[in-house]
Each structure stands twice: as C-alpha cells, then as structure tokens.
Amino acid sequence: MSFSESTLARFATEVAKYPPEQKQSAVMACLAIVQHEQGHVSAEAENAVAAYLGMAPIAVHEVTTFYNMYNQQPVGKFKLNVCTNLPCQLRDGQSALDHVCQRLGVEPYGSTEDGVFTVQPSECLGACADAPVMLVNDRQMLSFMGPERMDELLDTLNAQWREKEELGEKRATLELFVYISELVAKIERLLGLSE
C-alpha cells in the first residue's frame, strides 16, 4: 500500500514534532490520519505506517489494537462507544449499551445493515460521574445517556444522515440532468440542429 502525497505531507508534519531519532512517537497521529482518510486502519495500512516510521509492524499493530479509537475494520457513519467500565457499569453503562444494541438490532461491535451505526462497548471515557456516557465518532462526548436521551440521539442522527443522503441524491440527479442537457446541446450543434 502506498499513501498519497497529501497523506505523506500530513505524516511529515507530525513526524517533525519529534527529534529525528524518535519519529516513531508520531505513530498515533499517523494512524489517526489514515483512519480519517480511509475510515479504518487495515493491516495493510498498519504495515505501511510501520515502514514509513521505521518500526516493526507488530509495534504498530499493538497500538492499533490497544486503543479502541482505531477501527480495524470499516464502521458505520456514526460509531457509538458506550462506556462499560466498572464505575459506569454501576451507573447503568451496561444497560445503556444493551438499550442501544436492542434499539438498532445489533450485537456489540456490530453495524446496522444500512451502515449508518456501529455500536461498541468502551473502556473508561473519563466521565464516570456523568454515566452512562457515550462517545460519538471518537469526538463528541455525551453524558447522562439514559434510554430516552439515547432514543432521541439515535433518531436525530438517523434523520440527519437520511437528510444528507437525500440531498446528495438530489444533487447527483441535478448534476446528471445538467450533464445530459449539455450532451444533447453538443449533439444538436454537431448535427446542425441548433444555432
């Protein structure tokens, strides 16, 4: 696997933050870049990052598998991590995970058939007093996520995704219409049917 010029430039920016003999310190940043661009970090990408940083492939794999923020396989548009660590367990963390899985019809680590949601149990998210807590797409922390708030969140995310998808289809249809109209006009000009 080879990375694009822009990806390599982003890697170089991260590597430059460390002394040359410690460029392996940029491994997490490089993996985050790969995931941002590809949606997950494949074994092939791990090997390519290892080669770029001069590391053993197993060392990169250890990082990828240790942190659950790295997706080792494709995930849904919305990745939902529900904390199930002991303090959250004591404050309904497992019930929250069970509720989301039941509502979406998936098992933990599973994705919905339409590819919109992936649900994962999570280790500590650092907000034990706010349990149950959830992290959406490794970026947005949500607290006090009881069943009603979970349902509201799932409905909102699903509606946003459907709206975005619908707008994309309308845009694609419009672009196709414009393309066909331009093509017809060119053909008419070539055939001398238009001025």
Please place each PLM-identified region on the residue numbering.
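Feature of Fe-S/electron-transfer and energy-metabolism proteins
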Residues: 1-125, 129-130, 134-195
